Each structure stands twice: as structure tokens, then as C-alpha cells.
């Protein structure tokens, strides 16, 4: 169990290291405002912190640097979050207005990178059920019908239906009008249940067409592949902690390009309540063992549909990055929900 003095020194050491990137010597710590301890006392406390695995001594320096475990304790128990400055908040609010989901996601990714100087990442929206705005059927040829489905998100899906019999254009118009009149604005799952229970009220063949259309729409939308939008990966070239190792940096860019590891990591963040932080090896991605990933889920009308965040070095200003990610997630949620 760490005493208050040890916690105070660990906090001071990590804040100093985050600020200038140089290993922190005991003498430097003893001279910081509020420490009021001798160099000898500070050395003893630092030795204890090193034995606990919270700090380490680089071979080339007499000073100490925080370990991933030290950063974890700092973030969980010692960090003081600062309110986001008005200029940054205004930039986020001005650029995350209701728009198409694609534009909102791209804007969020770019803003996260711009405001943190790291890589901004956004897992694209995925919903267990999708509400539709309009459906239309077009006859292509005998027993071949094109279904055009427009979701409330503005997404347009075209699906080919191979039907049991040939339908006339008037029958297809009738089916489309009925669905739009009675079911528009509802999720496809709810529509499927209602169509099944209300089949007796409809002409048999038309009902079969509608049921097949709704089922195909559900299946196709469920299969839409998730994607990650990455912005500002090149900014990490300016991060001294990462750019010194070009081989590791190339591997990191490979993670951004493949996206597979990021997809899994951001999917974990979707289950979190609020901001989630992966420090070093906690991400489970070997290439990110010198990075921290700060994420937060975003919603559409209360339903979590994706995750966004920042990838940067473990030596990052967490007190600033965390509120940026948190507020961005809230604004993205508002912008996407407002559209509906």
C-alpha cells in the first residue's frame, strides 16, 4: 500500500516526465514546488517505487521514467482532469453538427488527431437493428425485382430479389406503398414481426414479397463490415518517443493500414461505460506496447453503435486527451441522433 508521500512523488515524477520527456532525477523532484523533501528522502521513495514496478531507470540516465504500470496507477488514482479549453470545445461543436454518418465519422477522426497531435480513430456505426425511411421495388425482368432500401441514416442499399412468381409494376408499387405507409421509421426487426403477424390482412403473394424483402434487408445490413477511419497517423512521426525506432513506427503504420487489430480493440471499448484507456501491453496488440489508446463509445438515440479515440505514446497528456475524447463522443452521439 502506497503512502501519501509516495503517491505525491509518483504523480510529480510522471507529470514532469510527460511535460519534457526527460528521465527525472531525485534532485529535480526535490526542488519541485510542494515536494519539500531532501534529495536523500526522495531517492529512498523512488527506490521503493522502482521495486514496486511503477518506475524504471534507463541505462543511459540516473533519472527515472514511469512504467506502463506506473501510468496505470497515475491514470486510475492520481490524475487531475482539466476542463477542455473553450477554443477546442468550440472547434468540436462547430464541426460535429448533424450530417451524414460518413461525414460525421470523418470529421470526428480528423478533429481528434488535430486537437491531440496523435492519430484519431473511429469505429464506424454498427447497429443491431436499422430503421428505414423508404422502400421501393422495381421490376428488372421476370421473377427478378430490385429492392431499394433507404435507412434513416441516409444509407441507400440495393438488393436483388428472386421471387416465386412474376410481379407487375403496379403490384410492386402497391407493396412498397403499403410498407412505407405502415412501417416507415421502424426497425427492420419490428417490421419483420409485424409483417408476419399481419399477413392474413394482405394479399398472399404481396405478403410473401414483403416478408422476403424485409428478411433480405435485415441479413444484408447485418453483414455490413465494420471499418475504422484513421486520421493523422503521420503525426506520430513528430512524436520523439515513437519516431526514434523507425522499424517500430513502420509496424505501427501497418496496424493502421490493416485495421484488423484496431477493429478488435475498438470493439472492446464499445462495451465500456465512458472513457476507456489501454496503456502499453493492455491493448493486447504487440505493436502498440509503447502506445496508449484512449477510447469512448458513441450512441444513436441511446444505443451504442461505435467507438472513437486516440492512439499516441504512453507519454501523453492524459488530463487533456481524456476530455477531448469524451466530449467528441458526446457530440458525435448528439449529431447522429439529431438526424433521426
UniProtKB/Swiss-Prot annotation:
Source taxon at top rank: Bacteria
SUPFAM superfamilies: GAF domain-like (SSF55781), Winged helix' DNA-binding domain (SSF46785)
Statement: the UniProt record of this protein carries the keyword Transcription: yes
Keyword Metal-binding applies: no
Single biological process term from Gene Ontology: negative regulation of DNA-templated transcription
One Gene Ontology molecular-function label: DNA binding
Signal peptide annotation: none
Keywords on record: Repressor, Stress response, Transcription, Transcription regulation
Family matches, as InterPro entries: GAF-like_dom_sf, HrcA, HrcA_C, WH-like_DNA-bd_sf, WH_DNA-bd_sf, WHTH_HrcA_DNA-bd, WHTH_transcript_rep_HrcA_IDD
Stored HAMAP family: HrcA
Function: Negative regulator of class I heat shock genes (grpE-dnaK-dnaJ and groELS operons). Prevents heat-shock induction of these operons.
UniProt record similarity statement: Belongs to the HrcA family.
Designated name of the protein: Heat-inducible transcription repressor HrcA
Amino acid at each position: 500500500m502506497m503512502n501519501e508521500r509516495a503517491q505525491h512523488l509518483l504523480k510529480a515524477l510522471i507529470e514532469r516526465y510527460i511535460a519534457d520527456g526527460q528521465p527525472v532525477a531525485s534532485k529535480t523532484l526535490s526542488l519541485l514546488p510542494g515536494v519539500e523533501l531532501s534529495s536523500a528522502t526522495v531517492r529512498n521513495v523512488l527506490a521503493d517505487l522502482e521495486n514496486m514496478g511503477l518506475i524504471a531507470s534507463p541505462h543511459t540516465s540516473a533519472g527515472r521514467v514511469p512504467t506502463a504500470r506506473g501510468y496505470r496507477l497515475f491514470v486510475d488514482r492520481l490524475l487531475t482532469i482539466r476542463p477542455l479549453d473553450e477554443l477546442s470545445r468550440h472547434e468540436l461543436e462547430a464541426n460535429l453538427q448533424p450530417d451524414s454518418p460518413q461525414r460525421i465519422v470523418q470529421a470526428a477522426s480528423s478533429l481528434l488527431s488535430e486537437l491531440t497531435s496523435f492519430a484519431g480513430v473511429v469505429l464506424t456505426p454498427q447497429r443491431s437493428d436499422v430503421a428505414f425511411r423508404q422502400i421501393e421495388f422495381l421490376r428488372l425482368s421476370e421473377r427478378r425485382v430490385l429492392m431499394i432500401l433507404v435507412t434513416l441514416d441516409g444509407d441507400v442499399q440495393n438488393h436483388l430479389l428472386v421471387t416465386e412468381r412474376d410481379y407487375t409494376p403496379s403490384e410492386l408499387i402497391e407493396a412498397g406503398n403499403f410498407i412505407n405507409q405502415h412501417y416507415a421509421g421502424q426497425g427492420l426487426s419490428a417490421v419483420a414481426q409485424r409483417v408476419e403477424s399481419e399477413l392474413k390482412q394482405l394479399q398472399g403473394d404481396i405478403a410473401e414479397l414483403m416478408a422476403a424483402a424485409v428478411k433480405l434487408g435485415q441479413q444484408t445490413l447485418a453483414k455490413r463490415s465494420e471499418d475504422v477511419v484513421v486520421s493523422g497517423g503521420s503525426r506520430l512521426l513528430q512524436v520523439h518517443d515513437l519516431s526514434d525506432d523507425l522499424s517500430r513506427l513502420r509496424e505501427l503504420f501497418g496496424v493502421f493500414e490493416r485495421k484488423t487489430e484496431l477493429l478488435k480493440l475498438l470493439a472492446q471499448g464499445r462495451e465500456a461505460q465512458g472513457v476507456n484507456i489501454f496503456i502499453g501491453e493492455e491493448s493486447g496488440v504487440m505493436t502498440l506496447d509503447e502506445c496508449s489508446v484512449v477510447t469512448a463509445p458513441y450512441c444513436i438515440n441511446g444505443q451504442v453503435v461505435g467507438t472513437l479515440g486516440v492512439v499516441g505514446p504512453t507519454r501523453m497528456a492524459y488530463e487533456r486527451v481524456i476530455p477531448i475524447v469524451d466530449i467528441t463522443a458526446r457530440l458525435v452521439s448528439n449529431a447522429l441522433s439529431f438526424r433521426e
